[in-house]
């Protein structure tokens, strides 16, 4: 079971990772450390040659049974740290500003605890220390490598700075939004700015398209569903006295329900093309699917709550986040459940002064160990 020495070890691992962050698909030293720490506990590491970074490990219980997976992401962000911590990043321009160092150390702790509880495991627990979550590419690599073959369910977490330590946010259904990107190119006819009647002004059309897109959600998506359309870049022209040939805009759409995700782009296309045509211009609409939404399987809600209760921790109804998470790609393949882990942080994710309370390390380690035991006892 967890004790002071265990907690101290988790802190040391987390601080080591924090001091030496590595960007997506560059987590070479991070991978070596994870392997070493697991090998020190005689935990089996699976050979997955398709993964150049990241670690897949496994603990088999003394009883045959299903295989479940627990995932932790391991990459950092291109951010200059401003925490002034004694263990602040030693890598210029790179920081664990989203707490993946916390996730990694915690789930190594879970593996350590479950290694001591093999007799209780009615099946196998596979640990996925995943690279490149920040660029939404790591989960795809893990799936392509076949790591989820034969796995019945997968579990994961994200630290939550606005929840106190010892509090876990749980809910069934949508938790994090789908993430998609769009581009719109408005093609007009360039000319002299003083003679606009001889041109087709793509900027004028673009302005109206921006306004028109604001109605896509409010007038086309159910008020019982959530969706956001954000235009984040608009570009046109190179000179103050020339009407350009075209204008461009791009942005992101966030949704929680599949129905909304499917409906939004067609409404956007109709608005863009219709308004452009009214100005005598043409609109070319492009849609780039990025990530689905995190959808928690309600089958595991009771287990997620029971694990916390057994340990004396509190669960609360998790608030949805419009952020994206490539854990959702696993959930497209197998059932899964993702939780918020309270860390009582000072700043939100991706902030250069992001910190968290290290007391949450042991909480997270214990929680996922208990959850694994319960799920393997109850999974159909």
From Swiss-Prot:
Binds 2 divalent metal cations per subunit. One of its GO terms (molecular function) is hydrolase activity. It catalyses: N-acetyl-L-cysteine + H2O = L-cysteine + acetate. Keywords: Amino-acid biosynthesis, Cysteine biosynthesis, Hydrolase, Metal-binding, Nickel. The keyword Hydrolase applies. Ni(2+) 1 binds at residues 98, 134, 350. This is N-acetylcysteine deacetylase. It comes from Bacillus subtilis (strain 168).
């Amino acid at each position: 079971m967890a004790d002071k020495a265990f907690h101290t070890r988790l802190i040391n691992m987390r601080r080591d990772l924090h001091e030496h962050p590595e960007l997506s698909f560059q987590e070479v030293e991070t991978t070596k450390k994870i392997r070493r720490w697991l090998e020190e506990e005689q935990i089996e590491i699976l050979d997955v040659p398709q993964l150049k970074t990241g670690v897949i490990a496994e603990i088999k219980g003394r009883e045959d049974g299903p295989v479940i997976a627990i995932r932790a992401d391991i990459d950092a962000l291109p951010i200059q740290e401003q925490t002034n911590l004694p263990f602040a990043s030693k890598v210029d321009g790179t920081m664990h500003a989203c707490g993946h160092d916390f996730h990694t150390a915690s789930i190594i702790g879970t593996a350590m605890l479950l290694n001591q509880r093999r007799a209780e495991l009615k099946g196998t627990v596979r640990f996925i220390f995943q690279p490149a979550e920040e660029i939404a590419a790591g989960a795809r690599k893990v799936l392509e490598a076949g790591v989820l073959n034969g796995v019945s369910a997968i579990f994961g977490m994200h630290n939550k700075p606005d929840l106190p330590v010892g509090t876990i946010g749980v809910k069934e259904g949508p938790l994090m939004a789908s993430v998609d990107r769009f581009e719109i190119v408005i093609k007009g006819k360039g000319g002299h700015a003083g003679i606009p009647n001889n041109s087709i002004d793509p900027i004028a059309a673009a302005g109206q398209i921006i306004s028109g897109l604001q109605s896509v959600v409010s007038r086309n998506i159910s008020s019982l569903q959530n969706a956001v359309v954000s235009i984040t870049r608009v570009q046109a022209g190179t000179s103050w006295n020339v009407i350009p040939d075209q204008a461009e805009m791009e942005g992101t759409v966030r949704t929680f329900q599949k129905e909304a995700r499917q409906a939004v782009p067609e409404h956007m296309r109709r608005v863009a093309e219709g308004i452009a045509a009214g100005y005598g211009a043409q609109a070319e609409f492009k849609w780039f699917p990025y990530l689905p939404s995190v959808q928690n399987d309600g089958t595991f809600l009771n287990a997620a709550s029971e694990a916390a209760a057994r340990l004396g921790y509190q669960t609360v109804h998790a608030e949805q986040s419009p952020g994206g998470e490539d854990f959702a790609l696993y959930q497209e393949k197998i059932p899964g459940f993702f939780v918020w882990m309270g860390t009582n942080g000072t700043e939100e994710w991706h902030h250069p002064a992001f910190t968290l309370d290290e007391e949450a390390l042991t909480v997270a380690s214990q929680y996922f160990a208990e959850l694994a035991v319960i799920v393997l006892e109850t999974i159909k």
